[in-house]
């Protein structure tokens, strides 16, 4: 069902002067949940696609799994660089939707698509030299060669992946995120079947092994991108925006706004990805058991993290709508409703993980003596990670709320402070200069994330409080 837009500027003064009623908060929570659930399931679908790929690659042997890990490191490092550019479509389009400006909704998508293509073409070509890069970084030449084969197929998923995110952002911005979920759910079994056929060679096709897995992902990524484009052109809720109208018209001012929003998002994502990569390197110094336990515990965190990611995008949309129509009280309410939802979900998941910490590692491990040792350490890390999980959920939702207000530069500075000025030094000191060992690394990550999350929530509180005061004064 398509929601009607609220008239811009309605009841602003009344809303600013009076406290939010319980019915307004209840409505906001319902609206946020309605937006968030398909977005969260779409994020989980991406994890499912990666998991099925790794399961199929695992049948090729340990060397292939190691190569896939290296290839994913190269690809995701690059993917994160451009992620902010296409993610900026969501707040720009949401604000235009709230302001009842359909031409600006279309223009927001247009600049996002162009940014994805312009950044994606050279970065895709760079992926084709993944083997040389990994060898230069000191990785095993044989494993690097296999990783290069995988990247030769996988690299072509970069551009369609970004374009799909931009199109998905438009869908969410106009309150219709469901088509992106249906596309993702359809893509998962198709990717599984195509990857199996191309890896092992069936139906008369050659056996391509690890290259086939990467190629399947790229083919499915392009299919998802095309499907999203078709949906945006043909489905009634999107037709009025004529999303590909004036596709080749360059809007320098809007591109500047997208870069101002998107580059700091990319920067913060790179800083976050980097600190977790650095933590993995530190864990590797404690041996393979510690590194394996770290990876399993992080995989659990990554799965839980997808739901706050969906809530975060919903926060961007809801706050963006309120900003677009000039309604500071609703913007504040939307952000804190989303932050509350993120906290409740992650607190519940943290409790569940704590209660099942001994069973979770068995889903990833066998019954050997080494596996038992890894499982024991993983269970201990999951207990240490209790504050880590909650803070991680809070920071991503608060970030989403701030993006709805076009606030991304100061959060980038907070990321520098939280991850690298505080978090990583704590990881190093507690891990290697105390008796905590691997637990010290995780405590350091938790400290950095708690600081980062607290700063983001505080900033959203301050900005929205000041905006409401300004509305009253006006």
Curated annotation (Swiss-Prot):
Its main location: membrane. One of its GO terms (molecular function) is xenobiotic transmembrane transporter activity. It is a multi-pass membrane protein. It comes from the Bacteria. Pfam families: MatE. Keywords: Antiport, Cell inner membrane, Cell membrane, Ion transport, Membrane, Transmembrane, Transmembrane helix, Transport. Multidrug efflux pump. This is Probable multidrug resistance protein NorM.
């Amino acid at each position: 069902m398509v929601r009607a837009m609220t008239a811009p500027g309605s009841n602003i003064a009344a809303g600013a002067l009076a406290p939010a009623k319980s019915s307004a908060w209840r409505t906001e929570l319902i609206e946020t949940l309605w937006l968030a659930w398909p977005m969260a399931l779409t994020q989980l679908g991406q994890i499912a696609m990666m998991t099925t790929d790794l399961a199929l690659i695992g049948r090729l042997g340990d060397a292939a799994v190691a190569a896939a890990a290296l290839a994913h490191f190269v690809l995701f490092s690059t993917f994160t660089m451009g992620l902010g550019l296409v993610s900026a479509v969501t707040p720009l389009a949401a604000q235009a939707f709230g302001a009842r400006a359909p031409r600006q909704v279309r223009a927001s998508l247009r600049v996002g698509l162009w940014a994805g293509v312009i950044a994606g073409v050279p970065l895709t070509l760079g992926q084709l030299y993944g083997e040389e890069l990994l060898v230069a970084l000191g990785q095993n030449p044989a494993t690097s060669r296999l990783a290069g084969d995988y990247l030769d197929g996988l690299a072509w998923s970069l551009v369609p992946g970004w374009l799909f995110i931009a199109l998905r952002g438009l869908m969410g911005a106009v309150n219709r995120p469901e088509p992106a979920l249906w596309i993702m759910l359809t893509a998962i079994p198709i990717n599984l079947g195509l990857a199996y056929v191309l890896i092992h060679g069936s139906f008369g096709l050659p056996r391509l092994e690890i290259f086939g897995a990467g190629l399947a992902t790229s083919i499915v990524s392009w299919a998802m991108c095309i499907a999203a484009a078709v949906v945006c052109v043909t489905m009634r809720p999107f037709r009025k925006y004529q999303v590909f109208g004036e596709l080749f018209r360059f809007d320098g001012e809007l591109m500047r706004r997208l870069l101002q929003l998107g580059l700091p998002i990319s920067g913060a994502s790179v800083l976050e990805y980097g600190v977790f990569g650095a933590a993995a390197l530190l864990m590797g110094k404690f041996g393979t058991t510690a590194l394996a336990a770290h990876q399993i515990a992080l995989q659990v965190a990554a799965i839980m993290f997808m739901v706050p990611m969906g809530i975060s995008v919903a926060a961007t949309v809801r706050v963006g709508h309120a900003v677009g129509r000039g309604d500071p009280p609703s913007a504040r309410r939307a952000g804190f409703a989303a932050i509350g939802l993120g906290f409740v979900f992650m607190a519940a998941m943290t409790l569940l993980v704590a209660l099942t910490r001994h069973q979770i590692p068995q889903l990833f491990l066998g019954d050997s003596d080494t596996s038992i040792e890894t499982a024991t350490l993983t269970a201990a890390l999951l207990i240490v990670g209790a504050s880590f999980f909650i803070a991680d959920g809070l920071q991503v939702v608060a970030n989403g709320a701030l993006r709805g207000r076009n606030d991304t530069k100061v959060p980038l500075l907070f990321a520098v402070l939280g991850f690298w000025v505080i978090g990583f030094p704590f990881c190093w000191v507690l891990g290697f200069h105390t008796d905590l060992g691997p637990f010290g690394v995780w405590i350091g990550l938790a400290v950095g994330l708690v600081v980062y999350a607290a700063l983001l929530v505080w900033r959203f509180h301050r900005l929205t409080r000041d905006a409401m005061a300004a509305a009253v004064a006006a």
